[in-house]
Amino acid sequence: MKKQICILGSTGSIGTQALDVIKQHPDRYETYCLTANNQYMKLAEQAREFRPAAVVIANEQHYEALKALLADCPEVKVYAGAKALDEIVEAQPIDMVLTAMVGYAGLSPTIHAIKARKTICLANKETLVVAGELICQLANEYRVNILPVDSEHSAIFQSLVGEGRNEIDKILLTASGGPFRKFTLEQMRDVKAADALKHPTWDMGAKITIDSASMMNKGFEVIEAKWLFGVSADRIQVLVHPQSIVHSAVQFSDGAVKAQLGVPDMRLPIQYAFSYPDRLPLNGDRLDLFKQPLEFFEPDMEKFRCLQMAYEAINQGGNMPCIVNAANEIVNEAFRHDRCGFLQMGEIIEATMQKATFIARPTYDDYVASDAEARRIANAML
């Protein structure tokens, strides 16, 4: 039986690479549903090629245009809106949901998919950043597997396969360091979005590329790792590794370290989440260790305040990571549209952390309210 896959965010970087994986294994996987936020033309194109049972465009303004583009594909049902996203993931035939949407918007459909007992292939890290405790509780309650798609978390996951109950001493989470690794604070003050969008080793969407430049992305990955692997933040060490060959590693209680290495290719962790515990053939480049040295550096927390703030947020707990995520989404977008300086992003996030209402034991409704409040506060400072 082919696995039926729903891709939330099929037009983005992860979504398009996931479709490439599916294309390479048509005997194993089938797309049941594809979704997008605004890119209705690309979504229609994908629907024509992969013929899913349904497509959902989150922005309802594009519904009629999408419907018209797929008028000659009556077997593809067209839906629109956030509610449709929540409902489609519950469809009975779906086996796996790949959450490749960007940002807070991924939270609600992920919760619905868990409650419908679908296997979650998690690429939307913000879901665990915002509501990690709630998501883990639900996954336990509904006995749902969450398989990481982020290259680093996939590497940690792969390093833990076969380890059973063996105790983790610490997690070594690697980071490329982004395009400004060697910049001084003065130089960083003047950088523009175009500079930040030139990532040295990975090809990603705009939002995550900016988060990588500020190292907020790595901060979010620390939070994600805490929830996925049950390891406290003080046992998650970030290593700047410019070559992006060692995707992450785990040190065990006997001092042994297991790591996963490979060329920077997101299709590998996507495919492993789809095929786990099996490994399938995948076309593409192979690692050549003779090509370059492997270097590791300590991150500069003064220069990259966003990474430090993520550690502070997880140590505070409660809704603080949710507040940080909301403020970050606002300043990230503002920076991309030249309405906010690069270092100003961190300043606004820090001020939002101080001003927003802290809730030690948040419910789902608290997360929704905290997200809205933090966005208002951050917006007011732009």
In which residue ranges do the predicted regions lie?
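Catalytic, metal-anchored helix/loop core of enzyme active sites in primary metabolism
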Residues: M1-L382
